[in-house]
Swiss-Prot record:
<feature type="transmembrane region" description="Helical">
    <location>
        <begin position="132"/>
        <end position="152"/>
    </location>
</feature>
<keyword id="KW-1032">Host cell membrane</keyword>
<keyword id="KW-1133">Transmembrane helix</keyword>
<feature type="transmembrane region" description="Helical">
    <location>
        <begin position="20"/>
        <end position="40"/>
    </location>
</feature>
<keyword id="KW-0812">Transmembrane</keyword>
<dbReference type="GO" id="GO:0020002">
    <property type="term" value="C:host cell plasma membrane"/>
</dbReference>
<comment type="function">
    <text>Participates in rearrangement of cellular actin to increase intercellular contacts and thereby promotes virus cell-to-cell spreadin$g.</text>
</comment>
<feature type="transmembrane region" description="Helical">
    <location>
        <begin position="300"/>
        <end position="320"/>
    </location>
</feature>
<keyword id="KW-0946">Virion</keyword>
<feature type="transmembrane region" description="Helical">
    <location>
        <begin position="44"/>
        <end position="64"/>
    </location>
</feature>
<keyword id="KW-1043">Host membrane</keyword>
<feature type="transmembrane region" description="Helical">
    <location>
        <begin position="242"/>
        <end position="262"/>
    </location>
</feature>
<comment type="similarity">
    <text>Belongs to the herpesviridae BMRF2 family.</text>
</comment>
<dbReference type="GO" id="GO:0016020">
    <property type="term" value="C:membrane"/>
</dbReference>
<feature type="transmembrane region" description="Helical">
    <location>
        <begin position="219"/>
        <end position="239"/>
    </location>
</feature>
<protein>
    <recommendedName>
        <fullName>Protein ORF58</fullName>
    </recommendedName>
</protein>
<feature type="transmembrane region" description="Helical">
    <location>
        <begin position="101"/>
        <end position="121"/>
    </location>
</feature>
């Protein structure tokens, strides 16, 4: 029997909290998969198509407003109830056109904004725990997308079943998150970040300028790797046919720095493996033939290239997280940095899809 204060329970709660953190991005992904088409675009479908970059931008703003976060943390149950209601309504009307149910696009935008506190709240709690717990959290985030990829492959998106995992992630994830907050490891992590009596606040916190002073080198390397990723991906999209028609299946890379960092280690030695590997993969994507079978191989190599670059950026994220581990607000800062990277990558992939799609 697994006790609620055991390490197994902590891993399970962390995994389910990861699925909860994925819900605002899954919400955008669902509407993009159902209603966004490359062949024709209207004002409404454009909202769904660009919803993920806008969600990243809104999340960055929320990371910079800790007062708003504290207020929203007390209302997570109400947000969950509203989101479940919105999902049920959208599932009920998913077979109708927007002319008959014109409120659906507005409901999509409103619910996306309502779900934004979940990634911030879960990250703030989970990253007070030991590093192994972080892996389960990121695995849960990635696993939630894998479920929807499987549903897309099975072509069940025209059924109401397509919305069911989203509701399960919401309700189950929130219940797990509330248990996670009370876990002994999370409380111990909070205690380690208590300020001594000469500090002005209850917990140790860093300003943006203090964080920059501690992590200047890591941030510079992260930005350099991000620019290299953007330039390389642009070359793949504009010079090869690899990304044509793959937009919906590339959505995981829109949030890659929130879901793929778990494969990284906090050691720069890993870069001596990841970066040459990425260079080889990028070269193969460009030089291989253009036959149907070879195009599939090139698409897989492109995905591996992106995973390698995300893992390389994840090395710097892990180093930043280690340097800022004493601060209670370090998870918000790291989340903001990851979201900036995701915003750049998602904007680039969206533009490429519009240009070559």
């Amino acid at each position: 029997m697994c006790r609620l204060d055991s390490e197994r329970a902590l891993s399970l709660f962390s995994y389910l909290s990861g699925t909860l953190a994925a819900t605002p991005f899954l919400w955008c992904f669902i509407f993009k998969a159902l209603y966004s088409f490359t062949l024709f675009t209207t004002e409404i479908t454009a909202v769904f198509f660009w919803s993920l970059p806008v969600t990243h931008l809104a999340l960055i703003c929320m990371c910079l407003c800790p007062a708003a976060q504290k207020q929203l943390d007390r209302r997570l149950e109400w947000i969950c109830a509203s989101a479940v209601f919105a999902a049920v309504v959208c599932a009920a009307f998913s077979g109708f056109t927007f002319s008959r149910v014109p409120f659906i696009p507005g409901l999509c935008v409103l619910n996306c904004l309502l779900l934004l506190p979940y990634p911030l709240a879960t990250a703030t709690a989970v990253y007070q725990a030991p590093p192994i717990v972080h892996r389960y959290y990121e695995l849960g985030f990635c696993g939630a997308f894998m479920v929807y990829y499987l549903l897309l492959f099975k072509k069940v998106f025209v059924s109401g079943v397509f919305w069911l995992p989203f509701i399960v992630f919401l309700v189950g994830g929130l219940l797990a998150f509330r248990h996670l907050e009370q876990h002994v490891y999370i409380r111990a992590g909070m205690q380690r970040r208590r300020a001594i009596f000469i500090m002005p606040g209850k917990y140790i916190t860093y300003s943006v300028f203090q964080a920059w002073a501690y992590c200047r080198r890591e941030v510079v390397v992260f930005v350099t790797l991000l620019l290299a990723t953007l330039i390389s991906t642009a070359s793949i999209g504009l010079l090869t046919p690899v990304l044509i028609g793959l937009d919906k299946y590339m959505t995981l890379f829109y949030v890659g720095l929130l879901s793929c960092v778990g494969v990284s280690v906090a050691s720069r030695r890993a870069l001596f493996v990841l970066l040459p590997l990425a260079a080889v993969l990028l070269t193969l994507v460009h030089i291989l033939g253009s036959g149907p079978d070879m195009l599939l191989v090139r698409s897989c190599l492109c995905c591996l290239f992106l995973v390698s670059m995300l893992a390389a950026m994840g090395v710097e994220i892990q180093l930043i997280r280690r340097k800022l581990h004493r601060a209670l607000n370090a998870p918000q800062m790291v989340l903001a940095l990851c979201t900036v990277g995701n915003l750049c990558i998602s904007c680039l992939l969206s533009v490429i899809n519009k240009v070559v799609g």
